[in-house]
């Protein structure tokens, strides 16, 4: 069934490409990890910015690796540093997101083109993938999940190629050696595991075909293992150096494995304990299937499982989807972003024939009513979610930090206190503090006490979602402070809770706080983030 029924798919595809770049330059903030597990770590090392190191990089058993960060983001940052052109942190952030758009665009389109056998299938896969809000928004953000998506796609493509060779009846094709391809496959699997420990989940079922291929081509398994081991050893040595300061202990006692820092192993051990996962939130085992998957696909679910049939159920992409969702559903901590690698694979498996009333072989010149309805719902769903998650979701935090970067930290002429309330944790690297004048503190209702470092001149206090009475006491504690005191909060929260003397010095309209919406009070739905200077 052709996609070019009631519209020209090329126009929509080209518009989607443009939207990728537009949304990459928007300021939405989806999850703290997109800052704190990437640029919060790297900019401290490369630009000497004052940052906060997340627990994954600061505990005695580090759970995140430097390897993927240096591989995917450090070349950009070092290039900026070597050129010597002074870019603001905001501009650096934009460049990183544009880089992600370009990498994701090339890898995704190339893999889908090669995964699917015919032109109509390729058009369908590319069309739905490019118009999904996950592709438009999430893939430009600096998550480890974005990198995972690219690596999963390439690995699924390699396995699919090997499967095709096994199932073909062409002796010339079966006799071809795949050593180079499998070497790089092993390397990508290694990088994928160091990037996210969840990576193998998406390859569990497809790897049955890989094992079958290895059984008949044992030398290929050796090349794949070699490709896996080389980056594994390199990244372990890199992490050991970064976290321990040297690799002297390894050189002296190479067989003492306690000297090695193996971050995926530490991550696996940490996440295997429910008490650790409870610190991040526990979810029912059905959350991915019944909550996250519908939020990701929306009307696309009907393209996937209409009439409980799908002609693609034996394909490698379908097996990767089932594998990823099933394995990740066994883990009691289930966030939506964990499933974003399945999106291009799911779109390859959309089965429009199941919702078409046309008989086999009948030429379709006009889209059936149900298809037209679902297509319009698909557009509406993805446009709304792209605007919500790509523009408004916590969209004022980074611009507000950029305001302080421009007006306080570049000049370094005055003292300041920033009290952030009812926002995601502000990533300090955006402030671009190179003079070590900043102290970052976190206060909560359960832990309201803090101690200021008198050697610092600027303070960033993350009050998180504290009760407004505690925030008022926090503000009161700075009554004798000689510098400027700022409260940064959603405009709706300020209007509801505060009538103290303050002056709004800056505001950003495209900001929405979804965590403190009170549906009994429509004022809480008012978007906007403000910076208020206390008088």
UniProtKB/Swiss-Prot annotation:
One of its GO terms (biological process) is GPI anchor biosynthetic process. It is a multi-pass membrane protein. GO terms for cellular component: endoplasmic reticulum membrane. Glycans are attached at residues 244, 276, 507. GO terms for molecular function: alpha-1,2-mannosyltransferase activity. The chain crosses the membrane at residues 11-31, 92-112, 142-162, 182-202, 221-241, 285-305, 312-332, 338-358, 371-391. Residues 32-91, 163-181, 242-284, 333-337, 392-535 are lumenal. This is GPI mannosyltransferase 4. It comes from Debaryomyces hansenii (strain ATCC 36239 / CBS 767 / BCRC 21394 / JCM 1990 / NBRC 0083 / IGC 2968) (Yeast). The gene is SMP3.
């Amino acid at each position: 069934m052709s996609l070019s029924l009631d519209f020209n798919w090329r126009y929509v595809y080209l518009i989607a490409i443009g939207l990728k770049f537009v949304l990459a330059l928007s300021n939405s903030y989806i999850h703290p990890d997109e800052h704190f597990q990437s640029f919060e770590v790297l900019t401290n090392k490369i630009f000497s910015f004052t940052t906060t190191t997340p627990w994954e990089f600061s505990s005695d058993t580090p759970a995140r690796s430097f390897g993927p960060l240096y591989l995917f983001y450090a070349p950009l940052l070092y290039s900026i540093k070597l050129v010597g052109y002074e870019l603001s942190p905001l501009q650096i952030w934009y460049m990183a997101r544009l880089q992600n758009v370009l990498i994701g665009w090339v890898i995704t389109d190339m893999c889908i083109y090669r995964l699917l056998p015919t032109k109509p299938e390729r058009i369908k896969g590319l069309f739905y993938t490019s118009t999904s809000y996950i592709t438009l928004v999430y893939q430009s953000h600096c998550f480890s999940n974005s990198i995972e998506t690219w690596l999963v796609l390439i690995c699924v493509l390699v396995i699919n190629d090997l499967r095709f060779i096994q199932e073909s009846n062409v002796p010339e094709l079966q006799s071809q050696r795949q050593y180079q391809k499998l070497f790089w496959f092993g390397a990508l699997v290694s990088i994928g595991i160091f990037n996210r420990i969840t990576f193998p989940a998406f390859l569990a079922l497809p790897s049955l075909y890989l094992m079958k291929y290895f059984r008949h081509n044992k030398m290929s398994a050796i090349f794949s293992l070699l490709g896996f081991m080389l980056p594994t050893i390199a990244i372990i040595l890199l992490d050991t150096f970064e976290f321990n300061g040297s690799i002297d202990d390894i050189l002296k006692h190479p067989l003492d494995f306690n000297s090695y820092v193996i971050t995926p192993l530490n991550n696996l051990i940490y996440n295997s304990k429910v008490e650790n996962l409870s610190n991040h939130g526990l979810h029912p085992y059905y959350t991915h299937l019944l909550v996250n998957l519908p939020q990701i696909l929306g009307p696309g679910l009907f393209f996937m499982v209409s009439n409980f049939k799908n002609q693609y159920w034996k394909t490698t992409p379908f097996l990767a989807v089932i594998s990823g969702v099933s394995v990740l559903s066994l883990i009691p901590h289930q966030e939506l972003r964990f499933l974003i690698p399945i999106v291009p694979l799911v779109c390859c498996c959309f089965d429009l024939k199941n919702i078409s009333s046309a008989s086999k072989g009948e030429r379709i010149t006009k889209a059936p009513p149900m298809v037209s309805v679902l297509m319009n719902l698909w557009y509406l769903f993805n446009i709304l979610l792209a605007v919500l998650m790509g523009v408004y979701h916590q969209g004022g935090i980074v611009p507000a930090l950029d305001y302080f970067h421009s007006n306080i930290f570049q000049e370094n002429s005055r003292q300041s206190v920033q009290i952030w309330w009812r926002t995601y944790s502000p990533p300090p690297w955006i402030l671009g503090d190179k003079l070590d004048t900043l102290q970052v503190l976190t206060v909560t209702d359960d832990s309201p006490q803090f101690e200021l470092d008198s050697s610092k001149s600027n303070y960033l206090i993350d009050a998180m979602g504290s009760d407004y009475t505690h925030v008022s006491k926090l503000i009161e504690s700075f009554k004798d402070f000689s510098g400027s005191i700022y409260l940064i909060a959603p405009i709706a929260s300020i209007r509801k809770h505060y009538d103290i003397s303050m002056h709004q010095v800056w505001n950003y309209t495209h900001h929405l706080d979804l965590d403190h919406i009170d549906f009994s009070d429509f004022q809480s739905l008012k978007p906007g983030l403000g910076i208020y200077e206390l008088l």
